[in-house]
Amino acid sequence: DYLTTDTHNPLEQNYYEKGIEEINQKSDLIIFTDDVEWCKNNSFFKKKNIYFAHEFTKSIDILDLCLMTKCKNHIIANSVFSWWGAYLSHQEKVIAPKYWFKNTKNSNLKTEDLIPNSWIQIEN
Protein backbone atom coordinates (compact mmCIF):
# COMPACT_ATOMS: atom_id res chain seq x y z
CA ASP A 1 0.00 0.00 0.00
CA TYR A 2 2.91 2.42 0.62
CA LEU A 3 4.22 1.85 -2.87
CA THR A 4 1.32 3.84 -4.33
CA THR A 5 0.62 6.48 -1.68
CA ASP A 6 1.55 10.14 -1.78
CA THR A 7 1.87 10.27 2.01
CA HIS A 8 4.50 7.70 3.00
CA ASN A 9 7.81 6.53 1.60
CA PRO A 10 8.59 2.83 1.67
CA LEU A 11 11.66 2.32 3.86
CA GLU A 12 14.86 1.14 2.23
CA GLN A 13 16.86 -1.92 3.26
CA ASN A 14 19.54 0.43 4.62
CA TYR A 15 17.11 1.66 7.31
CA TYR A 16 16.57 -1.89 8.57
CA GLU A 17 20.31 -2.65 8.49
CA LYS A 18 20.97 0.45 10.62
CA GLY A 19 18.20 -0.61 12.98
CA ILE A 20 19.72 -4.04 13.48
CA GLU A 21 23.11 -2.42 14.19
CA GLU A 22 21.48 -0.09 16.72
CA ILE A 23 19.81 -2.96 18.55
CA ASN A 24 23.15 -4.80 18.42
CA GLN A 25 21.86 -8.23 19.28
CA LYS A 26 22.48 -11.61 17.81
CA SER A 27 19.03 -12.88 18.70
CA ASP A 28 16.48 -14.20 16.25
CA LEU A 29 14.55 -11.71 14.14
CA ILE A 30 10.89 -12.02 13.29
CA ILE A 31 9.84 -10.18 10.14
CA PHE A 32 6.27 -8.89 9.95
CA THR A 33 5.45 -8.06 6.34
CA ASP A 34 2.70 -8.15 3.77
CA ASP A 35 5.29 -8.79 1.05
CA VAL A 36 6.87 -12.09 2.11
CA GLU A 37 7.95 -13.02 -1.42
CA TRP A 38 9.97 -9.82 -1.83
CA CYS A 39 11.68 -10.47 1.51
CA LYS A 40 12.44 -14.09 0.68
CA ASN A 41 14.01 -13.03 -2.63
CA ASN A 42 16.16 -10.36 -0.96
CA SER A 43 19.57 -11.60 0.22
CA PHE A 44 19.38 -9.41 3.34
CA PHE A 45 16.54 -11.59 4.67
CA LYS A 46 18.28 -14.92 4.01
CA LYS A 47 20.20 -15.00 7.27
CA LYS A 48 19.70 -18.08 9.38
CA ASN A 49 18.28 -16.24 12.40
CA ILE A 50 15.39 -14.62 10.50
CA TYR A 51 11.85 -15.95 10.64
CA PHE A 52 8.67 -14.66 9.07
CA ALA A 53 5.68 -14.02 11.31
CA HIS A 54 3.23 -15.54 8.83
CA GLU A 55 4.82 -18.93 9.57
CA PHE A 56 3.40 -18.65 13.10
CA THR A 57 0.32 -16.48 12.65
CA LYS A 58 -0.90 -17.44 9.15
CA SER A 59 -0.98 -13.68 8.41
CA ILE A 60 -3.96 -13.11 10.69
CA ASP A 61 -3.60 -9.44 11.65
CA ILE A 62 -4.65 -9.73 15.29
CA LEU A 63 -2.23 -12.62 15.81
CA ASP A 64 0.55 -10.60 14.17
CA LEU A 65 -0.19 -7.72 16.53
CA CYS A 66 -0.22 -10.03 19.56
CA LEU A 67 3.13 -11.53 18.55
CA MET A 68 4.58 -8.04 18.03
CA THR A 69 3.68 -7.10 21.59
CA LYS A 70 5.74 -10.06 22.85
CA CYS A 71 8.93 -8.97 21.08
CA LYS A 72 11.74 -7.47 23.15
CA ASN A 73 12.98 -4.99 20.53
CA HIS A 74 11.35 -3.44 17.49
CA ILE A 75 12.48 -1.92 14.24
CA ILE A 76 9.26 -0.41 13.00
CA ALA A 77 8.12 0.79 9.62
CA ASN A 78 6.37 4.12 9.21
CA SER A 79 3.02 2.41 9.64
CA VAL A 80 0.29 2.55 12.24
CA PHE A 81 0.25 -1.24 12.55
CA SER A 82 3.92 -1.59 13.46
CA TRP A 83 3.70 1.53 15.66
CA TRP A 84 0.95 -0.08 17.77
CA GLY A 85 2.83 -3.37 17.94
CA ALA A 86 5.82 -1.59 19.47
CA TYR A 87 3.79 0.78 21.65
CA LEU A 88 1.80 -2.03 23.26
CA SER A 89 4.87 -4.13 24.01
CA HIS A 90 7.21 -3.96 26.99
CA GLN A 91 10.11 -3.23 24.70
CA GLU A 92 13.71 -2.59 25.52
CA LYS A 93 14.40 -0.64 22.32
CA VAL A 94 12.25 0.68 19.52
CA ILE A 95 13.88 1.93 16.34
CA ALA A 96 11.66 4.25 14.31
CA PRO A 97 12.22 6.18 11.09
CA LYS A 98 13.20 9.81 11.59
CA TYR A 99 11.03 10.88 8.68
CA TRP A 100 7.57 9.33 8.85
CA PHE A 101 5.96 11.05 5.87
CA LYS A 102 7.14 11.95 2.39
CA ASN A 103 8.78 15.35 2.29
CA THR A 104 8.87 15.67 6.09
CA LYS A 105 12.31 17.22 5.82
CA ASN A 106 10.93 20.19 3.90
CA SER A 107 7.34 20.50 5.06
CA ASN A 108 5.22 21.72 7.94
CA LEU A 109 4.27 18.18 8.98
CA LYS A 110 5.12 17.80 12.66
CA THR A 111 5.83 14.39 14.13
CA GLU A 112 7.01 15.29 17.65
CA ASP A 113 3.93 13.69 19.23
CA LEU A 114 4.12 10.61 17.04
CA ILE A 115 7.29 9.04 18.42
CA PRO A 116 7.70 8.54 22.20
CA ASN A 117 10.87 10.07 23.68
CA SER A 118 12.26 6.66 24.63
CA TRP A 119 12.25 5.47 21.01
CA ILE A 120 15.36 5.85 18.86
CA GLN A 121 14.88 7.60 15.53
CA ILE A 122 17.33 6.90 12.74
CA GLU A 123 17.73 8.36 9.27
CA ASN A 124 15.71 6.82 6.50
Predicted features along the sequence, with ranges:
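Leloir-type glycosyltransferase catalytic cores
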Residues: 104-124
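Low-complexity, compositionally biased segments
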Residues: 4, 37-38, 67, 116, ...
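A donor-sugar binding/catalytic signature common to diverse glycosyltransferases
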Residues: 61-107
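Core catalytic architecture of nucleotide-activated donor-dependent transferases building glycoconjugates
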Residues: 1-59
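Intrinsically disordered regions, especially transient/low-confidence alpha-helical propensity segments
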Residues: 12, 35, 80-81, 97, ...
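Short, glycine/charged-enriched secondary-structure capping and boundary segments
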Residues: 44-47, 89-91, 109-111
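Residues at the C-termini of beta-strands that transition into short coil/loop
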Residues: 54-56, 98, 118, 123
